[in-house]
Design a protein with these regions (language model features):
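A structural signal for multi-pass alpha-helical bundles of membrane permease subunits
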Residues: 6-284
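Short, intrinsically disordered terminal tails adjacent to the first/last structured region
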Residues: 1-4
Length: 284
């Protein structure tokens, strides 16, 4: 029998869902549809768009700065995804062992994730420039300095968050399986690669998805740490799109086309990555 509260929820659920649904329509769906439409137009405001067909997409794909930003973001995402997940998993594995102070270490490793991105960037800007100053260099002296500076910053910020997810996964592992492996004579390497990692695929799927999408969406750290210097050589996709839209007169449509391409790219890569890791999760 359905309770009175259950009957009330069934009767009025639409009323409670309406504010969230309206916010989704107004805040996401309508701007998204308008953005896709304007990517095919030449415009200065959203009301004066003139249809241009695929011209904006052609200009975007021929823009050398955009292609360089694509390569920069791709390389950055590959490096940070590997580094963050490997280190976060290793730390999580160590902290799930019976070691003294493990709770304190978990808090310490997670703390960088609580600091705002812009503030964190300026802290690391001072630190990295202070080190490079010994050789008469600055973070914006070469694109490679900016690249590795961003890698260090983002890894330091996100490792703690991914560590928490891995710790939750490790603590949920069935102990009877691990005990059976030990009884059968499996060594540490065999236990890790044939039992623990396959069973950890749900956590690996989540963490790899987050690091891949965060890598491509990098903006505030890129803006504050290098601002694309030198000569836009350390500029990621998000920063390039923003500068195209707001900084190049008459290129608003091209900037919008870049944003649509960016959305498609991240969505496709995220779906492929999720499919690959999920298939291993099912097989495990």
């Amino acid at each position: 029998m359905i309770s009175m509260a259950g009957k009330a929820i069934r009767r009025w659920w639409a009323l409670f869902a309406l504010p969230t649904f309206a916010a989704f329509i107004i805040g996401f769906l309508v701007p998204f549809i308008m953005g896709v439409y304007l990517s095919f137009c030449e415009f200065t405001t959203v009301t004066d768009g003139e249809w241009m067909g695929l011209k904006n997409y052609t200009k975007a794909l021929k823009d050398k700065e955009f292609l360089h930003a694509l390569g920069f973001s791709t390389a950055f995402t590959i490096v940070t995804t590997i580094v963050i997940n490997v280190i976060a998993f290793a730390i999580a594995y160590m902290l799930t062992k019976a070691i003294k102070g493990s709770t304190l270490f978990r808090s310490v490793f997670f703390m960088p994730n609580l600091i705002g991105g812009i503030i964190l960037c300026y802290i690391w800007l001072l630190l990295l420039n202070g080190v490079l100053a010994h050789w008469g260099r600055a973070l914006t002296y070469k694109a490679s300095y900016g690249f590795w500076g961003l890698v260090i910053l983002v890894c330091w910020q996100q490792i703690g968050y991914m560590m928490i997810i891995y710790i939750a996964g490790l603590q949920a592992l069935p102990t009877d399986v691990l005990e059976a492996a030990a009884v059968d004579g499996a060594n540490g390497r065999q236990t890790m690669f044939r039992i623990i990692i396959p069973l950890m695929m749900p956590s690996i799927t989540v963490c790899s998805f987050l690091t891949v999408t965060n890598g491509f969406k990098l903006y505030d750290q890129n803006l504050a740490l290098t601002n694309g210097a030198p000569s836009n050589m350390s500029e990621g996709l998000a920063l390039n799109i923003t500068r195209t839209f707001y900084g190049r007169m008459g290129w608003e449509g091209v900037g919008q086309a870049k944003a649509v391409l960016f959305f498609i790219l991240v969505a496709v890569i995220a779906l492929i990555q999720n499919k690959l890791t999920t298939s291993k999760e099912v097989a495990a």
